[in-house]
Amino acid sequence: MERNFETVMIEQCAPVLASLKPAGLFRYETRDCADLARRVKNWNTQLNPKGLRVRVLKGCVLNHRYLVYVYRESKLAAVLADEKVQSFLRNEGYRLPEAGEAPDAGNMLTQLSRKLCCSAEFPHEIGVFLGYPLGDVVGFIENRGKNFTCCGCWKSYGDPDAAQKHFDQLSKCTAVYLRLFHSGTPILRLAVAA
């Protein structure tokens, strides 16, 4: 089957659609920027009632590659409301509201997008925005991707058994969603309302 926008979205973001993760990210290649904009707008129209949003975080018209972010606004807001996450993001250069105020997810994603587009170094704190445990994100940064205890959907630096169990759950979800999608179940039916 052709790896069109929808296929790649299922491959990379099934756990987000199933409400097992707050967010997912995939690379999409197209020479037709207008078509990509239409697809993002169309999917937002369809998925917003289920609590999902689609956004292009980074795009390059020279190589026609785009990073598309699919997320559950309420789950991302919960991640960003965590004081430890906020402290970590402040240390990574993010502007957040005063203590006690909830950060605006859209504003935080705009800051992440700027870092993706303008920073010389890849912003590994993106793991927080993808719902990876803070300890794993910090562990990855401090260890430069080495010395992990388990590797699956991301590199884990905590309990390897718990991490593997979680990775297995996410992989099973993706396999089931791909099977259903390839059997004709539309994405809108696969997306769980939150």
Task: Cite the ranges covered by each PLM segment.
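Internal catalytic-core helix/loop-beta-alpha segment
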Residues: 93-124
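Non-catalytic, substrate/partner-engaging modules appended to enzymatic cores
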Residues: 96-97, 117, 138, 150-165
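Short linear loop/turn motifs
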Residues: 103-107, 141-144, 151-158
